[in-house]
């Protein structure tokens, strides 16, 4: 996502339906090759390319514990942040399909958190979320401007929920299991964590998680 401004809105709290997690899998050889052969940033797929569009329109799957504990995942997380923050993109979020991997991984700038130093300048931090799903969405919605790295030179107002509950794999706990059990950590259920997010950051999460379902913001225009 590459629209950085959204007006402040009043937020309410609510109850909603839940979504079960999908199946997990290891990186394929093609995915490992893509990650390992990428330089400092990855190519961003766009709808202007037919082959790219097929990837952008496909649903993404979760990663296994083995994949998440691999150097390939660590490298992927670094590359996704480097790509979305590169001056050629200057985005606020990016999803796996946008860099060629139909995996449920997103990198999101947390405007709801305190700024940190980045290249000597204070800015809101980017964080990477593996196996992410939206569990609950608020009934309260609002329109706001959105753009997309994969839909060049366009923007539009999109109706989004003002608050969401997300669930994703807790990498800190997963790494703790690895330290405790070694490779046996992969035999345990993946530890998860939930987070309630509101405001502009909630909009970014919805936009990026849409990508994991093969949905682009232009599909939501009325």
Which residues does each PLM region occupy?
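Positively charged
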Residues: 18-222
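Bacterial Sec-dependent N-terminal signal peptides
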Residues: 1-26
């Amino acid at each position: 996502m590459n629209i950085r401004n959204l007006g402040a809105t009043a937020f309410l709290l609510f109850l909603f339906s839940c979504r079960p997690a999908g199946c997990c899998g290891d990186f394929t050889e093609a995915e490992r090759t893509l990650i390992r052969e990428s330089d400092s940033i990855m190519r961003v797929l766009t709808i202007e390319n037919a082959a790219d569009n097929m990837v952008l329109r496909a649903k993404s799957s979760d990663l296994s514990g083995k994949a998440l504990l691999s150097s390939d995942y660590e490298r992927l997380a670094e590359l996704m942040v480097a790509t979305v923050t590169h001056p050629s993109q200057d985005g606020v979020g990016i999803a796996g399909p946008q860099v060629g991997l139909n995996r449920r991984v997103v990198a999101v700038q947390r405007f709801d958190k305190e700024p940190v130093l980045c290249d000597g300048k204070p800015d809101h931090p980017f964080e990477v979320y593996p196996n992410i799903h939206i569990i609950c969405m608020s009934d309260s919605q609002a329109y706001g401007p959105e753009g997309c790295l994969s839909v060049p030179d366009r923007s539009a107002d999109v109706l989004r929920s003002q608050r969401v509950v997300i669930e994703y794999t807790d990498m800190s706990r997963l790494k703790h299991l690895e330290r405790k059990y070694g490779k046996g950590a992969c035999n345990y259920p993946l530890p998860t964590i939930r987070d309630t997010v509101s405001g502009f950051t909630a909009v970014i999460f919805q936009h990026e998680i849409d990508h994991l379902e093969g949905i682009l913001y232009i599909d939501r225009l009325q």
